[in-house]
Amino acid sequence: MAGCILLLRGFILTLILHQVELSVFLPAPKANNVLRRWRRGSSYFLEEIFQGNLEKECYEEVCNYEEAREVFENDVITDEFWRQYGGGSPCVSQPCLNNGTCEDHIRSYSCTCSPGYEGKTCAMAKNECHLERTDGCQHFCHPGQSSYMCSCAKGYKLGKDQKSCGPSDKCACGALTSEHIRMTKSSQSQPSFPWQVRLTNSEGEDFCAGVLLQEDFVLTTAKCSLLHSNISVKANVDQRIRIKSTHVHMRYDEESGENDVSLLQLEEPLQCPSSGLPVCVPERDFAEHVLIPGTEGLLSGWMLNGTHLATTPMLLSVTQADGEECGQTLNVTVTTRTSCEKGSVVMGPWVEGSVVTREHKGTWFLTGILGSPPPPGQSQMLLLTAVPRYSMWFKQIMK
């Protein structure tokens, strides 16, 4: 009996060992599958050498943000991919700035901003001016203590929303009236702006251009204002107004041409809008960060026909040009008080006092005035005096 029991125990032990062998050693096909698997832990050195593979990293397996970054090697492209990647969390890239809190959604995210910040990614401080604001100031923006503040150009007032600007009188600057637009469309000649004027000497000869900044003040170049002692302003064919006083910029340098600006005060104001309309002078920050970059301007004025001004005003579309390139092309020094504009054609003999204006949300602003005519037939570029840099001086003289 004892022998039978021992024999039975041996048989059971043999079966157990056989099952253990089957569970430890896999059949050949399964074993081969194991051998063919990509062993990430043992291939770390190779993965660091070669750029990541998107299919292997993020589609055969679920990847993290760092692995996706290895594939694209570019933060912007990686963030865009990560927002669309089904297996990833958009919040991993920490899109919410200034200690904002990120919340994941299906293929998107939202930010809860810290106090004092706003915007999709909490990038904008509520008390600062930002170009990205779609609901910001129509004209000028100023940082405040708890919120930014808006202001308007001369002749406008803030709307109820404290952001929009509406004309408050008939001489509101840079606002083309329906009457002027109708006259422009019916004219057979090139269109002109109601703020453009010509300077005339005592013999009735036109010699320079200017621009109306206020109903009783005209901006021209210092050089033009000093050419004759008896100057009149011609706003249209029938009306000529004599100059009461001339205000040349105190730092005008005749030799270098620096600060080549002058304000001419009229003996009597022009009648708005029938005889003319002022153009708006932009604040410096608004001009240099909002108005000018990447926008198209209009060069307007008259060209020289021999030694005389042509009778028909001209217009030419221009864009801001690189200062270094402009300086090399024109062989001039571009300073903080000058700017360059580039046209689509070679510049003709534009007369001194011709101007560049830009339209912003229905209002026209003055950004440059021409001090010297360009070299004939040589370049598409012009060097102008940067008008916004003198806005405070204008206010002091015209107050």
Curated annotation (Swiss-Prot):
This is Vitamin K-dependent protein Z. Residues 23-40 form a propeptide. Keywords: Blood coagulation, Calcium, Cleavage on pair of basic residues, Disulfide bond, EGF-like domain, Gamma-carboxyglutamic acid, Glycoprotein, Hemostasis, Hydroxylation, Repeat, Secreted, Serine protease homolog, Signal. GO terms for biological process: blood coagulation; proteolysis. Disulfide bonds join C58-C63, C91-C102, C96-C111, C113-C122, C129-C141, C137-C150, C152-C165, C208-C224, C326-C340. InterPro entries: Coagulation_fac-like_Gla_dom (IPR017857), EGF-like_Ca-bd_dom (IPR001881), EGF-like_dom (IPR000742), EGF-type_Asp/Asn_hydroxyl_site (IPR000152), GLA-like_dom_SF (IPR035972), GLA_domain (IPR000294), Pept_S1A_FX (IPR012224), Peptidase_S1_coag_factors (IPR050442). GO terms for cellular component: extracellular region. Belongs to the peptidase S1 family.
